[in-house]
């Protein structure tokens, strides 16, 4: 065990003492001028500020490779404790979140004072903390969902203003209280009224949490409106004026008197026409005594006088 720890320490020290060689990458590379004559200098930017400075980028080797190598080399020890550590790491790491690119999986610093057992204990304790965080997060989400339950069921209880609630909403930690003897009937009535007052799916928003109250007067008006739409339009001004004239007594009396006079005149006219038709059948249209048939003929005198010669 001591030999393995010594070899690990020497390898880590050798990796740390290696110099980091920066890789210089030249970014400012001017394009090839094929149209020009070649006399002009290509070191200018064209904006009048002078020559372009050379920009270099340096890359440093990340120290994560040696840490991963140390962790993979740790389970090679012959003691059973290293196997236990390997089993714990392999069973817990898949449950944790996947690391991003370039991020170390498990960071472990190597110091001269640490031994292999200290490294194993550090490796085994860190994944356990991640599992505890996952458990607390799951409990917090469960509490949030239970707290939202009374809020979603609250609009169904306000369907009718006449019905009063019999039980208050319970907290997430408290058990559900049983309603009194009349509680079940009240809940059933509210559910039935809510089902009848809900809007159809084609007109509403598609959610059953929102309900609207409708009274008997509104339904009666809705039933009468289609009948009124089918009737032809009526001039309201003319009907109002005629009703106003008929309400007056003078106008009503004049209308009745005119009707009676017209009736009498019609009867007289019909009687006169009948009388003329009767006279026509008799052959005389005059109302005087009839004349003689011979007209102006000479008539012998009835008295005769005697003459002597």
UniProtKB/Swiss-Prot annotation:
Membrane topology: Single-pass type I membrane protein
Cleavable signal peptide: 1-22
Positions bearing carbohydrate: 37, 43, 45, 47, 205, 215
Record function comment: Cell surface proteoglycan that contains both heparan sulfate and chondroitin sulfate and that links the cytoskeleton to the interstitial matrix. Regulates exosome biogenesis in concert with SDCBP and PDCD6IP. Able to induce its own expression in dental mesenchymal cells and also in the neighboring dental epithelial cells via an MSX1-mediated pathway.
Gene name in the database record: SDC1
Chain positions of site Cleavage: 241-242
GO molecular function annotation: cargo receptor activity; identical protein binding
InterPro entries in UniProt: Neurexin-like, Syndecan, Syndecan/Neurexin_dom, Syndecan_CS
Keyword tRNA processing: no
Biased composition (Acidic residues): 32-42
Family: Belongs to the syndecan proteoglycan family.
Post-translational modifications: Shedding is enhanced by a number of factors such as heparanase, thrombin or EGF. Also by stress and wound healing. PMA-mediated shedding is inhibited by TIMP3.
Name recorded for this polypeptide: Syndecan-1
Subcellular localization, as worded in the UniProt entry: Membrane; Secreted; Secreted, Extracellular exosome
Pfam families reported for this sequence: Syndecan (PF01034)
Entry keyword Secreted: yes
Subunit structure: Interacts with CDCP1. Interacts (via C-terminus) with TIAM1 (via PDZ domain). Interacts with MDK.
Classification via PROSITE patterns: SYNDECAN (PS00964)
Parts of the chain on the Cytoplasmic side: 275-309
Annotated Low complexity bias: 173-183
Keywords for the protein's UniProt record, in alphabetical order: Glycoprotein, Heparan sulfate, Membrane, Phosphoprotein, Proteoglycan, Secreted, Signal, Transmembrane, Transmembrane helix
Positions in the Extracellular compartment: 23-253
Source superkingdom: Eukaryota
GO biological process, one term: striated muscle cell development
Native organism taxonomy: Eukaryota, Metazoa, Chordata, Craniata, Vertebrata
A cellular component annotation (GO) from this entry: external side of plasma membrane
Residue(s) carrying Phosphoserine: 284
Region of interest called Disordered, as start-end residue ranges on this chain: 28-57, 145-185, 283-309
């Amino acid at each position: 065990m001591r030999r393995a720890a010594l070899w690990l320490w020497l390898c880590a020290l050798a990796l740390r003492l290696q110099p980091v060689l920066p890789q210089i990458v030249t970014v400012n590379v001017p394009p090839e001028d094929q149209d020009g004559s070649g006399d002009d200098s290509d070191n200018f930017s064209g904006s009048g500020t002078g020559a372009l400075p050379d920009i270099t980028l340096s890359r440093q080797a990340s120290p994560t490779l040696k840490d991963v190598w140390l962790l993979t080399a740790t389970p090679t020890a012959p003691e059973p404790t290293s196997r236990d550590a390997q089993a714990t790491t392999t069973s817990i790491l898949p449950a944790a979140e996947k690391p991003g690119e370039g991020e170390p999986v498990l960071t472990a610093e190597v110091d001269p004072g640490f031994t292999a057992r200290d490294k194993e204990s550090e490796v085994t304790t860190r994944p356990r903390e991640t599992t505890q965080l996952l458990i607390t997060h799951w409990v917090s989400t469960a509490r949030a969902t239970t707290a939202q339950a009374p809020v979603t069921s609250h609009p169904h209880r306000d369907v009718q203003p006449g019905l009063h609630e019999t039980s208050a909403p319970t907290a997430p930690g408290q058990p559900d209280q049983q309603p009194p003897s009349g509680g079940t009937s009240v809940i059933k009535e509210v559910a039935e009224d809510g089902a009848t007052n809900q809007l159809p799916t084609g007109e509403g928003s598609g959610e059953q949490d929102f309900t609207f109250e409708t009274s008997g007067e509104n339904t009666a008006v809705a039933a009468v409106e289609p009948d009124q739409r089918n009737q032809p339009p009526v001039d309201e001004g003319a009907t109002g004026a005629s009703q106003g004239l008929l309400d007056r007594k003078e106008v009503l009396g004049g209308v009745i008197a005119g009707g009676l006079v017209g009736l009498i005149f019609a009867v007289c006219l019909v009687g006169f026409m009948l009388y003329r038709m009767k006279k026509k059948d008799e052959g005389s249209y005059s109302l005087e005594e009839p004349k003689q048939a011979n007209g102006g003929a000479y008539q012998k005198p009835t008295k005769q006088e005697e003459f002597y010669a």
